[in-house]
Every structure is written in structure tokens, then in C-alpha cells.
Design a protein with these regions (language model features):
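Sec-dependent signal peptide recognition
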Residues: 2-7
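C-terminal motif of bacterial Sec signal peptides marking the signal peptidase cleavage site
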Residues: 12-15
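Electrostatic cytochrome c docking/interface patches
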Residues: 17-38
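Extracytoplasmic electron-transfer domains, predominantly the class I c-type cytochrome c fold
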Residues: 35, 53-118
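Short cysteine clusters
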Residues: 42-45
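Beta->alpha turn/N-cap motifs
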Residues: 48-49
Length: 118
């Protein structure tokens, strides 16, 4: 009788994880990604869940990114492609208004973890 109770308790506690941690399967530190999104000024053009910023948006809102089938108009939506887009959007779409901001690989991974988990 004790085992089912302990198993139930373990399952309940497993669901009480850190909301800033990237979901299973994603690399990176989502909490650091939220900070990096603010530091790189992404909020100047985008509405981002959990990141305060401008009310004038040039780029698309960055909410529910994980539900989008594609990113940047052509890429299958996965973390690797999102990191590529964040780091060098001009290489993917030379006509994009999104600038190359010199985002490091580590920061792009963390930023993608935040975006794909919120």
C-alpha cells in the first residue's frame, strides 16, 4: 500500500518543477534566455511573454513559439533552426528586417529555450 502512495507523491512532486527550466528535450537555461532576450533588445521589436518592452512592434509576437510549424517563413520549427535564426537571420532571409545582433551560441540556445517553453 505504501508504494502506490509514494509513487503518487513522486509524480506530483515531479510536476512541481522550475517554470524557468527548459522542457525535456530542449537544451539551455530558459531563465537565462529570458534575461538575454531583454539584454539584446529583442523587446524593442517583439512582444515576448514575460519580457516587458515596447508597445510598437515591428516583428511578430514571440508567444507560443513551440506551436508554430515553421519559423522565419521557411524553416521547420525546432530548437536548432531557432538558434540559427537568432544568430544570423540575414543568412536565412536576406530581406528580413531582423538585424544580426552578434548573439553568442550559448545565449541563442538559452533564448530559444525560453521562447519554446513560453
Amino acid at each position: 500500500m505504501k508504494r502506490p502512495v509514494l509513487l503518487l507523491a513522486a509524480l506530483v512532486l515531479a510536476g512541481c518543477g522550475d517554470a524557468n527550466r527548459a522542457p525535456v528535450g530542449l537544451q539551455g537555461d530558459a531563465a537565462r534566455g529570458r534575461i538575454a532576450l531583454a539584454q539584446y533588445g529583442c523587446r524593442a521589436c517583439h512582444m515576448i511573454p514575460g519580457v516587458t518592452g515596447s508597445k510598437v512592434y515591428v516583428g511578430r509576437p514571440l508567444e507560443e513559439m513551440a506551436k508554430r510549424p515553421i519559423i522565419a517563413g521557411t524553416l521547420p520549427n525546432n530548437q536548432a533552426n531557432l538558434v540559427r535564426w537568432i544568430r544570423d537571420p540575414q543568412a536565412i532571409d536576406p530581406k528580413t528586417a531582423m538585424p544580426v545582433l552578434g548573439v553568442s551560441e550559448r545565449d541563442a540556445i538559452d533564448m530559444s529555450a525560453w521562447l519554446l517553453s513560453h
